């Protein structure tokens, strides 16, 4: 990659495979191919963001990559690469840790283990362009819209697939026999010792964590799991289309963050804790959430209490009411706080 004439942008960030500056300016790749445009329902030109939104069901991403799995996007993969069968392909606009746009997107063929670089087919014309949007993209700091229904980022079709996938994850007989990514997902779920937000098996709980990360635009494995179970999802005879367990999960996730923040800011008003704060894994979880090892012992004790109590209460308001006897419980949480708590669960 030649970056001599592509300086690093101050405040640049990746969004749907595009590189955005602090304002309305951004860089993107434009793909010109009639079949590609028709598949995505567009007229002539297709941007990398169009491909990303199609692959990720309209959910935003904060990465320079788009990962396409064969089971769910075989037609799109064939148009983009002329490959007739594979596990997945990756389109990369640049590096996650280096906000510099490639001169041309890189294409990789991926099996379960290795990446192999590929050349773009001659039928695909690609141009790197700098553009100015009509307005700055939304960059919400606070997670005000996270609990709003209907969900802005999860449409009806995706919600139905997520609900089916959640149910299938309870039946190990329907798991793929040889899928390294999915097997790793299972291992990490079963190894987690952090207390869950709701009562459900570890694998289903980890899936909910990844769905929430997907909605927040963070790196996640939701699409990988959907792809691994794609055949089983398509063969369900009586699909369950409501995903209320995810709504419950989100309410408890947000409430956990609200309580942790409130405990941190008002711990001196709380009664002296009687329980020992010696649960190593939960203790580290609380410390990581607050970005430090030297967390006040009262904050640590009550933080552990909240983590362990949340899944046991039917309504998280009961836990809020308990703390409101002593402190003011904060209303707002940030997206970064939600992401930080979720990422400690895998």
Curated annotation (Swiss-Prot):
Pfam families: Herpes_U59. InterPro entries: Herpes_U59/UL88. Belongs to the herpesviridae U59/UL88 family. It comes from the Viruses. This is Protein U59.
